[in-house]
């Protein structure tokens, strides 16, 4: 079975979150269209994401060797094991769906902490001194979707100026070697339930075309 990794970044329950509501509809529809996939879910507000400490690394984005690992205390070793587990989980997936709100022109901090964990030398990227880093996740077909909710309606100009989250996620995915990337914006959720529902319904209409864009 192929694997879809569904990553959510919102403390709200699904029924109150526009990004998670659209995210659920998206993954359900994807699984309907692609029965050879199974889903694995990762809630970054419930999952422990290690804070990266210098003791965990022997060089940039490269975890410590065995000798250095054995000198760490038990808690530090557990943190290193968690980083490896998160990175392996990401690497094993075929399709990635990330659902997050726009916060401060970007996204909630847990997503950045997670990305810092999984961009790892020898696993998702190849980093050699004096050479340009290369992504390692071009080893098989992969695709990624970033589902983002925002209160404001994003015209082209406003999106370029304010929407840093989508551009960053696309860049980091391609940096790791994942070339197929699509965005699914749930913008204009506004301040009323009616506005939010309209934005969600509009996003629902785009789900099939986004799925076709990544797989």
Curated annotation (Swiss-Prot):
Cofactor note text: Binds 1 FMN per subunit.
Residues at which FMN binds: 17-19
UniProt keywords, alphabetically: Flavoprotein, FMN, NAD, Oxidoreductase
Reactions catalysed: 2 a quinone + NADH + H(+) = 2 a 1,4-benzosemiquinone + NAD(+); N,N-dimethyl-1,4-phenylenediamine + anthranilate + 2 NAD(+) = 2-(4-dimethylaminophenyl)diazenylbenzoate + 2 NADH + 2 H(+)
This enzyme's EC code(s): 1.6.5.-, 1.7.1.17
Record InterPro entries: Flavodoxin_fold, Flavoprotein-like_sf, FMN-dep_NADH:Q_OxRdtase_AzoR1, NADH:quinone_OxRdtase_FMN_depd
One of the record's GO molecular function terms: oxidoreductase activity, acting on NAD(P)H as acceptor
Co-factor requirement: FMN
Its job: Quinone reductase that provides resistance to thiol-specific stress caused by electrophilic quinones. Also exhibits azoreductase activity. Catalyzes the reductive cleavage of the azo bond in aromatic azo compounds to the corresponding amines.
Record text on subunit structure and interactions: Homodimer.
Family to which this protein belongs: Belongs to the azoreductase type 1 family.
Name under which the protein is recorded: FMN-dependent NADH:quinone oxidoreductase
Taxonomic placement: Bacteria, Bacillati, Bacillota, Clostridia, Eubacteriales
């Amino acid at each position: 079975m192929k694997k879809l990794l569904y990553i959510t970044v919102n403390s709200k329950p699904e029924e109150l979150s526009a990004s998670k509501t659209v995210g659920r509809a998206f993954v359900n529809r994807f699984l309907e269209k692609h029965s050879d996939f199974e889903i694995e879910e990762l809630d970054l507000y419930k999952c422990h994401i290690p804070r990266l400490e210098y003791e965990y690394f022997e060089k940039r984005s490269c975890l410590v060797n065995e000798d250095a690992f054995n000198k760490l205390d038990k808690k530090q070793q557990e943190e290193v094991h968690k980083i490896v587990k998160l990175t392996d989980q990401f690497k094993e997936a075929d399709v990635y769906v990330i659902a997050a709100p726009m916060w401060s022109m970007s996204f909630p901090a847990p997503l950045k902490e997670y990305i810092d964990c999984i961009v790892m030398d020898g696993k998702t990227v190849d980093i050699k001194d004096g050479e340009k880093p290369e992504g390692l996740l071009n080893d098989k077909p992969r695709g990624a979707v970033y589902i983002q909710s925002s209160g404001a309606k994003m015209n082209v100009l406003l999106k370029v100026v304010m929407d840093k989250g989508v551009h960053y996620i696309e860049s980091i995915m391609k940096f790791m070697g994942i070339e197929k990337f699509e965005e699914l914006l749930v913008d204009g959720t506004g301040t009323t339930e009616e506005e939010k529902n309209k934005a969600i319904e509009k996003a629902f209409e785009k789900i099939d075309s986004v799925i076709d864009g990544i797989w």
